[in-house]
Amino acid sequence: MVSTIHCDSLWYGADIVTMRGGKYHLIPQGAMAVTDGKIVWIGPYNELPRLSASREVIYSSGLITPGLIDCHTHLVFGGDRSAEFEQRLNGVSYAEIAANGGGIVSTVRATRNASEQQLLEQALFRLKPLLAEGVTCIEIKSGYGLSLESEIKMLRVARQLGELLPVTVKTTCLAAHALPPEFSGRADDYIDFVCDTIIPQVAKEKLADAVDAFCEHLAFSLAQVERVFLAAQQAGLPVKLHAEQLSSLHGSTLAAKFNAMSADHLEYATESDVRAMADAGTVAVLLPGAYYLLRETQCPPIELFRQYNVPMALASDANPGTSPALSLRLMLNMACTLFRMTPEEALAGVTCHAAQALGLQETQGTLETGKLANWVHWPLSHPAELAYWLGGQLPASVVFQGDARP
């Protein structure tokens, strides 16, 4: 006698794009059974086992993809730098803007001056458009406080976002983002402060899931970043790195040495960097929004990532200076158009590979038995349309941990 499987809910009637192994692996007319917020069965509807579901949801058509994951953002910050955008378009250089108190220094000042509640309200305003596009998991960095009090304030706000809205929030301590004004000309002293004070306190309060740094001529050196990584290691936190965005310092090789979850930007990564990332299992997080806004001309080495089987993730890099992007779907099109990624690679970049960049590959990023029941139902007929359309085509519905998101 065939036993009956009991589940909380059964969902069927749409084609399911599972993204197993980074490929579409489409199930026509698929079905998913969910219990306790996890998928307990997935497959073609006509192969359903005997099920008893407390609730059934029938999709009349369309596509289901895994919930989208934005694995690199700077959503929490104070102030507004839209005026700088106009200035740059009128020929004012970034150096001139910075000399007049603008640039990242203005964001640091505004973030320090803002209350926790003000930062929370502003971040909610930025997060909601991403959720409307089907984002079910997001990473949020600190890095605009650059003091113990303000870095902790930013991370607390990021944690609150995950408590207030139906979305998984992973937080990253990016205190080694820029040099605060009070440490002008004393970068090593600031790195001492980050390593000896900020990272240990953030770890003690369990406010961060990872530690990041910015390795670049205008930020921090390889030696300074290595000290940050050692402090993170001592605190029991994994690392990731902004690397090779504007020049080749081989920061991604250093990141790989520390088994970083990801190295991000990577426009100037070399073959040796890519090989090191492949050996370490470090994900390449590509950020076409920043590439676009900065009018960069050097693309990340996509062919090398393919050759060495380095997983490529995509993210919005939502931030006030170089990527004021509140659309992860737009990044799919940009990655295909600017970086020549395929639509399938792009979708993998905001699902399974983005999950890997956050260390969440065991629970999110694909639609498989045992994974969280996070998915998006789209009024589309082919998954390539997600990268093809510029704007529009919002999800018909989003499911987060087995429940339809309001």
UniProtKB/Swiss-Prot annotation:
A Gene Ontology molecular function term of the record: imidazolonepropionase activity
Name assigned to this protein: Imidazolonepropionase
GO cellular component: cytoplasm
Subcellular location: Cytoplasm
Pathway entry: Amino-acid degradation; L-histidine degradation into L-glutamate; N-formimidoyl-L-glutamate from L-histidine: step 3/3
Keywords: Cytoplasm, Histidine metabolism, Hydrolase, Iron, Metal-binding, Zinc
InterPro entries the UniProt entry points to: Amidohydro-rel (IPR006680), HutI (IPR005920), Metal-dep_hydrolase_composite (IPR011059), Metal_Hydrolase (IPR032466)
Annotated Fe(3+) binding sites: 72, 74, 242, 317
CDD domains: Imidazolone-5PH
Entry's EC annotation: 3.5.2.7
Function: Catalyzes the hydrolytic cleavage of the carbon-nitrogen bond in imidazolone-5-propanoate to yield N-formimidoyl-L-glutamate. It is the third step in the universal histidine degradation pathway.
Example of a GO biological process term: L-histidine catabolic process to glutamate and formamide
Superkingdom, taxonomy of origin: Bacteria
Needed co-factor(s): Zn(2+); Fe(3+)
Family: Belongs to the metallo-dependent hydrolases superfamily. HutI family.
Cofactor binding annotation: Binds 1 zinc or iron ion per subunit.
Binding site for 4-imidazolone-5-propanoate: 81, 144, 177, 245, 322
Residues the record lists as binding Zn(2+): 72, 74, 242, 317
Reactions that this protein is recorded to catalyse: 4-imidazolone-5-propanoate + H2O = N-formimidoyl-L-glutamate
Residues where N-formimidoyl-L-glutamate binds: 144, 319, 321
Species for this entry: Yersinia enterocolitica serotype O:8 / biotype 1B (strain NCTC 13174 / 8081)
